[in-house]
Amino acid sequence: MKYPQLSLRETNAPYMEEMKTAAAEVIEGGWYIRGKYVSRLEEQLCAYLGCRYAVATGNGLDALRLMLRAYIEMGVMQPGDEVIVPSNTYVASVLAITDNGLVPVFVEPSIHTYNLDTSLVERAVTARTRAIMVVHLYLSLI
């Protein structure tokens, strides 16, 4: 069976010139950590999401680690709790879970979307399940 391949070139094509310009501005500005572009991104995220705070991180692993740590600090989760995650996930998802003392529960993806198969998720939920980490590796949200 052949599977369609994700073409990042096609996906990014409509935005390429804008991305090149933005990247050049950041490089020429010399601020890769914090700085006005990161502050602007955080402000725009707050406006878009309708929230008061947003924190840009260096990578997805850091973001996932902080999110799960916040849930633990708020008492929503505790070490030993389970987090359902797609079996075809990127390793950062699993590292964020295990680094926080949580237990990953792997669920197979749908053959049609490559995302979590919802019928299998229902069967994987236990009394220790506290979260489902939705990972859309192939730009498909459904």
Q: Which residues fall in each region the model found?
A:
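N-terminal "arm"/small-domain region of PLP-dependent enzymes with the aminotransferase-like
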Residues: 1-31, 36
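Conserved beta-strand segments of alpha/beta enzyme cores
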Residues: 2-4, 53, 103
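Short hydrophobic motif
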Residues: 7, 23, 45-46, 83
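PLP-dependent aminotransferase class I/II
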Residues: 9, 38-43, 48-54, 119, ...
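Short alpha-helical
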Residues: 14, 40, 62, 91-92, ...
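Phosphate-binding glycine-rich loop
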Residues: 31, 36-82, 96-98, 106
